[in-house]
Amino acid sequence: MKPLKTELQDAETLIELGSASVQVVHDLKNQLNGLKLYATFLRTRMEKAERPADELETIGKLIAGLERGANDMTLLVRYGRPLELSRRPSTDLARLLREAAEGAHVETDGGAYEGDFDPALLAEALKNITRGGRASAPAVEEGGAEVRLTREEADVSGASALVEWRGVPVPDTDGDPFRSFNGGAGLRLALAARIIRGHGGEVYSEGGGVIRVRLPLQ
């Protein structure tokens, strides 16, 4: 068993390493964005020079890859930094959920679903869960998740809201999709879970595209 002082030193080292890693990722993201600008300029020159279609297609794929990499690094930097919530009392969770569902059917039991939430961040988290971490909503032919919102009452902890998704197109993973960090989708789900927990809530996956989130209400 390690002495307490050694354990504290190890913890401090990990914190410092985490901060340094976030800064390195941030710098790499800026470099990728710079490369994307150069590649975009090059594509414009190639278009004016009427270069062959296969060359233009190649440079287009390069730009798209640089953009995906920069976006993933942005998500990683956000996840690694402290979460700052701008809470607003009496924020309507039902409204946020309907907007985040992007046309998917949302079933509610009625009643009030107001809480002390950061509307922008919570809406982002709900949208990312509904999409299964994808950067855009699933195509119409793929179908979407079914969403249900219910209110729970407890004598000790007070009222809470339970959001249940069925049919979420979560990325393939052997473990918890909120801890996989697998590509952009995994990072978005991990950030969504962090936002939910930052509001005092819980998030867990039941498998088979079933996800549940519980959030405290006023």
Residue spans of the language-model regions?
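Conserved DHp (HisKA) dimerization/phosphotransfer helix of two-component histidine kinases, i.e.
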Residues: 38, 54-103
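A residue-level detector for a conserved hydrophobic packing site
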Residues: 122-123, 129
